[in-house]
Amino acid sequence: MRPLWLLTLLLALSQALPFEQKGFWDFTLDDGLLMMNDEEASGSDTTSGVPDLDSLTPTFSAMCPFGCHCHLRVVQCSDLGLKTVPKEISPDTTLLDLQNNDISELRKDDFKGLQHLYALVLVNNKISKIHEKAFSPLRKLQKLYISKNHLVEIPPNLPSSLVELRIHDNRIRKVPKGVFSGLRNMNCIEMGGNPLENSGFEPGAFDGLKLNYLRISEAKLTGIPKDLPETLNELHLDHNKIQAIELEDLLRYSKLYRLGLGHNQIRMIENGSLSFLPTLRELHLDNNKLSRVPAGLPDLKLLQVVYLHSNNITKVGINDFCPMGFGVKRAYYNGISLFNNPVPYWEVQPATFRCVTDRLAIQFGNYKK
């Protein structure tokens, strides 16, 4: 059994997302943190690449900063009131946890010698300044969590090995062109909770990125940003001030399977806008100002979940969700939420939901008066 404290630490690092994440980017115990490079280090069969933790006798590196806990290449220095990055960190460290401290600056040599570091956690500090070469030694860094700090810009010269960047809840107002240059491995960026407006994204800001996941929630967006990566599978823009979805807004995002637009001010979705999303499986439009079900849902043959609750929908047509006629192939819905709308649910014809797996998948009632 993996040490309980280590599991607790790693699970605590993930931040709440706008709606349920089905394991796509949840931060759990990653085997990469525990990989051993030599048999002597593990004392067990290394054919699998991961040591048998049950057979290991707990050992502590001779290099462990005062007050920190060091075990199995994990250095935990959280909640210590640290003002700076501690010294005497073992060079074979793979996870360094510095969250919940008072660090205000990352200096040039703070991470010197940590060439094996895989994950760096700096959440909830007071970081406002980062030296341009602070991350240079981190040639194997894949996960950088630097949320809930005082950053006003995205750090320069991020490691090219980086896969996941969580930089939400800072003070970033601008995403300049070239800031992500060379990050060919980047897969996930979480940058919600920053005062970003549409004008803050320079043309080409995301050039070269092949992201699967992007979240820009709880910002100041009034529309869907232009020129986001075409490779996106998940795009979360909830809790903004978006008022409308125009025809060209979703044109380049044909690979999306989850789109989050809940908690905005959307009144209008232009006809045909959703036709550019042939692989869409999950659509969140709850807590907006829609007066009708968006057009085009029956044509999205893979769509299975639609959240439309807490809008101003007054009528639901018999063909709003399902294709007309019989024999038209499409995936069955397993979730449609329409509660907290002013539509009288007793007036909706049962055939409206003929392509839903089960009546329990339909959330209706609690209509607005």
From Swiss-Prot:
It is found in: Secreted, Extracellular space, Extracellular matrix. GO terms for cellular component: cell surface; extracellular matrix; extracellular space; sarcolemma; transport vesicle. GO terms for biological process: articular cartilage development; blood vessel remodeling; bone development. Disulfide bonds join 64-70, 68-77, 322-355. It comes from the Eukaryota. InterPro entries: Leu-rich_rpt, Leu-rich_rpt_typical-subtyp, LRR_dom_sf, LRRNT, SLRP, SLRP_I_decor/aspor/byglycan. Pfam families: LRR_8 (PF13855), LRRNT (PF01462). GO terms for molecular function: cytokine binding; extracellular matrix binding; glycosaminoglycan binding. Glycans are attached at residues 42, 48, 271, 312. Residues 17-37 form a propeptide. Residues 1-16 form the signal peptide. The keyword Membrane does not apply. Homodimer. Forms a ternary complex with MFAP2 and ELN. May be involved in collagen fiber assembly. This is Biglycan. It comes from Rattus norvegicus. The gene is Bgn.
